[in-house]
Amino acid sequence: GYMVLASAVHYSDRLKAAIDIVGISNFVTFLTNTQDYRRDLRRVEYGDERDPAMRAFLEEISPNNNVEKISVPMFVAQGENDPRVPVTEAEQIVESLRNAGKTVWYMNALNEGHGYRKKENRDLYQQAVILFLEQHL
């Protein structure tokens, strides 16, 4: 997820395409939109966005704030009901990439959470990935 997005920001010249699965696209919005019961644990893991210096750092490393550096086609996969990474993380990176004129495919399974567990969604996802890679590799 996040590592794919970060790799696309920093190493687009070495990649042909990228597939982001339930990735954090902006740490500040991720922490803001994470459910209350998980937020404090995520702050320990990633940093506390309420601290101005940490907030600035989190904004700086967030792929959504660096889409101009992404030059590879991107496939973004998300589950609408993801309790770990809010769907807004996928929606905002897709919107930013599209607004910047970048190539982006988006698959949001409305009946899934963090990853695709249902066979019909896994099958559709795998077919979409094959098409994406055939087109961009």
Summary of predicted features, one role per range:
Residues 1-137:
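Active-site-proximal cap/loop segments of hydrolase catalytic domains
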